[in-house]
From Swiss-Prot:
GO terms for biological process: methionyl-tRNA aminoacylation. Homodimer. A motif ('HIGH' region) lies at residues 15-25. The lineage of its organism: Bacteria, Pseudomonadati, Pseudomonadota, Gammaproteobacteria, Enterobacterales. Its EC number is 6.1.1.10. It comes from Salmonella enteritidis PT4 (strain P125109). A motif ('KMSKS' region) lies at residues 333-337. Its cofactor is Zn(2+). Binds 1 zinc ion per subunit. Pfam families: Anticodon_3, tRNA-synt_1g, tRNA_bind. It is found in: Cytoplasm. It catalyses: tRNA(Met) + L-methionine + ATP = L-methionyl-tRNA(Met) + AMP + diphosphate. One of its GO terms (molecular function) is methionine-tRNA ligase activity. InterPro entries: aa-tRNA-synth_I_CS, Anticodon_Met, Met-tRNA-synth_bsu_C, Met-tRNA_ligase_1, Met-tRNA_synth, Methionyl/Leucyl_tRNA_Synth, MetRS_core, MetRS_Zn. This is Methionine--tRNA ligase.
Length: 677
């Protein structure tokens, strides 16, 4: 039965543009793509979009490390991501970037509306600052102990253990991820989104059916603990969009990231010359449906901040959030050392996309449970289901049809009632696809496949083929088998796009959900060719080994400090023990008249003063900034007479030279004169 066509916009969470796509990412994109392909088969208007999340300090710093601009890095990463998704047949209508004109305009529009409506608040805050790098530290560049559950090694914006969000200043024992230094507090004016104003709306939306029950229950905990205003600004230097009329202030990446859904759709509409669909889909009273597929780690942002931002700026809210769990491999977290941290591109060098699409689909449900990719079970299931049950059904019958009947199917079904049993299952299987009970859909389909194969076993066409005068029976039996195969592949089409294309070529007919009511009768099929190959554990072993080698290659420095300055010849412990390293306090620092390279440092060793000349002037053009700082010096180096005076030691610094010299400093708590061991 044909359904009333709906307008549907589907998104996946935006991959961050500083790393490759791996099998953890692919779970979400496969889940969404299967759902989208089913919706399209049912005749709905579906727009499936995504983009790279391309802003933030991590991208800025990684680009600096690579010696390229952030724009160049995110451009290259976008191409890599799109290639990976295309390789897995993820059928996006558009793949864009948050670093785009569309996203800038929409971010500014939403911010302006929120501000005009009184939902943006300004206040001065004390913020963590890296004294060694001279920069404010974004959330993800501070780590410490979660103030809520006391889990160690958590980022400065939210805890990956308990899901709580907080300010970086609330972290216990924070450390800069950039330098390892203990941050200091500095004041800065920031802009806040008044999330508590939307508490009543959000609680109603939470219980409206827009969220899975597990998510709604978790949100209730957050409501009970009280919503806080959300800091949406970051200080320069920052790679992102500058806030209007606020020089040196930038939108926090999590403000413009979800707006990227809108930006990508706007870009798609503009490409099509479509001037009406954007408003039709995003206006406050839109009757279109909006679905976000996301992982459970970003529920807080999508279930609180995002709908509140949309409500406050007079746009529509999502129809549903579809939240999934994490991927484990062989029962454990993905591991680089074990070779189970597998990139999407690496997978495609060893297996086809349909195999992973099928395995993930067979394990997915509408719940937020984690999915385990057991590689041995993967091989067994793909061979047992796709090869033995489904493809084998076609191969057992196609040969007789091709050879004995010139590829023409019988004019009537051998068992109309059995065929009706298969087509009647469309309601149950369709509902399972619709409700994202993918595992249930696969179980129903494979149960039918068992029935179809039993039918062929019982009818034994290979026996009938040898009996004189039974050509009509043989044609009817094999035609029945091929028609049952057609129904099964129609149900599996959202999952197995590549195999489906081969099947359509063989059947000489499109796999169409509504068309299965009518079997293929007196229809000519094409010559049968192998549709799918068995897989084995040797491929798995090669995949795991290749992943290990990629990790080794990534860890090996092709260029950089070790390549430019190889480690010196090995010394003995006794040689090293002769060097006396001490903590020193810089009491004074000044230029040396007549030298453009040296600074004169007066060092306090805790009761003894030293005069040291150091060639660090190019890196520290303001020597006064060094006063009061601690460093490390070689205290037992023989005094050296220089043109400007006597140098009584050497301070320790890293870097290749020039402006890239970095004076070493001990952690807080070290005292002048203490020995460095």
């Amino acid at each position: 039965m044909t359904q009333v066509a709906k307008k549907i916009l589907v998104t996946c969470a935006l991959p961050y543009a500083n790393g490759s796509i791996h099998l953890g990412h692919m779970l979400e994109h496969i889940q969404a793509d299967v759902w989208v392909r089913y919706q399209r088969m049912r005749g709905h208007e579906v727009n499936f979009i995504c983009a790279d999340d391309a802003h933030g300090t991590p991208i800025m710093l990684k680009a600096q490390q690579l010696g390229i601009t952030p724009e160049q890095m995110i451009g290259e990463m976008s191409q890599e991501h799109q290639t990976d998704f295309a390789g897995f047949n993820i059928s996006y209508d558009n793949y864009h970037s948050t670093h785009s004109d569309e996203n800038r305009e929409l971010s500014e529009l939403i911010y302006t509306r929120l501000k005009e409506n009184g939902f943006i608040k300004n206040r001065t805050i004390s913020q963590l600052y890296d004294p060694e790098k001279g920069m404010f530290l974004p959330d993800r560049f501070v780590k410490g102990t979660c103030p809520k559950c006391k889990s160690a090694d958590q980022y400065g914006d939210n805890c990956e253990v308990c899901g709580a969000t907080y300010s970086p200043t609330e972290l216990i024992e924070p450390k800069s991820v950039v330098s390892g230094a203990t941050p200091v507090m500095r004041d800065s004016e920031h802009f806040f989104f008044d999330l508590p104003s939307f508490s009543e709306m959000l609680q109603a939306w939470t219980r409206s059916g827009a969220l899975q029950e597990q998510v709604a229950n978790k949100m209730q905990e957050w409501f009970e603990s009280g919503l806080q205003q959300w800091d949406i600004s970051r200080d320069a230097p920052y790679f992102g969009f500058e806030i209007p009329n606020a020089p040196g202030k930038y939108f926090y990446v999590w403000l413009d990231a979800p707006i990227g859904y809108m930006g990508s759709f706007k870009n798609l509409c503009d490409k099509r010359g479509d001037t009406t669909s954007f408003d039709e889909y995003w206006k406050k009273d839109s009757d279109a449906e909006l679905y976000h597929f996301i992982g459970k780690d970003i529920v807080y942002f999508h279930s609180l901040f995002w709908p509140a931002m949309l409500e406050g700026s007079h746009f529509r809210k999502p129809t549903n959030l579809f939240v999934h769990g994490y991927v484990t491999v062989n029962g454990a977290k993905m591991s680089k050392s074990r070779g189970t941290f597998i990139k999407a591109s690496t997978w495609l060098k060893h297996f086809d996309a349909d195999s992973l699409r099928y395995y993930y689909t067979a394990k997915l449900s509408s719940r937020i449970d984690d999915i385990d990719l057991n590689l041995e079970d993967f091989v067994q299931r793909v061979n047992a289901d796709i090869v033995n049950k489904v493809v084998n059904l076609a191969s057992r019958n196609a040969g007789f049809i091709n050879k004995r009947f010139d590829g023409v199917l019988a004019a009537e079904l051998a068992d109309p009632q059995l065929y009706k049993t298969f087509t009647d299952a469309a309601a149950v299987i369709g509902e399972a696809w619709e409700s994202r009970e993918f595992g249930k859909a696969i179980r129903e389909i494979m149960a039918l496949a068992d029935v179809a194969n039993r039918y062929v076993d019982e009818q034994a066409p290979w026996v009938v083929a040898k009996q004189e005068g039974r050509d009509a029976d043989l044609q009817a039996i094999c035609s029945m088998g091929i028609n049952l195969f057609r129904v099964l592949m129609t149900y599996l089409k959202p999952v197995l796009p590549t195999l489906s294309e081969r099947v359509e070529a063989f059947l000489n007919s499109e796999l169409n959900w509504d068309a299965i009511e009518q079997p293929l009768l007196s229809h000519k099929v094409n010559t049968f060719k192998a549709l799918y190959n068995r897989i084995d554990m040797k491929q798995v072993e090669a995949l795991v080994e290749a992943s290990k080698e990629e990790v080794k290659a990534a860890a090996a420095p092709v260029t950089g400090p070790l390549a430019d300055f190889p480690i010196q010849e090995t010394i003995t412990f006794d040689d090293f023990a002769k060097i006396d390293l001490r903590v020193a306090l810089i009491e004074n620092a000044e230029f040396v008249e007549g030298s453009d390279k040296l600074l004169r440092l007066t060092l306090d060793l805790g009761g003894e003063k030293r005069n040291v000349f150091s060639g660090i002037r190019s890196a520290y053009p303001d020597p006064q900034a060094l006063i009061g700082r601690q460093t490390v010096m070689v205290a037992n180096l023989a005094p050296r007479k220089m043109r400007f005076g006597v140098s009584e030691g050497m301070v320790m610094a890293a870097g290749p030279g020039g402006k890239d010299i970095f004076l070493l400093s001990p952690d807080d708590g070290a005292k002048p004169g203490q020995q460095v061991k």
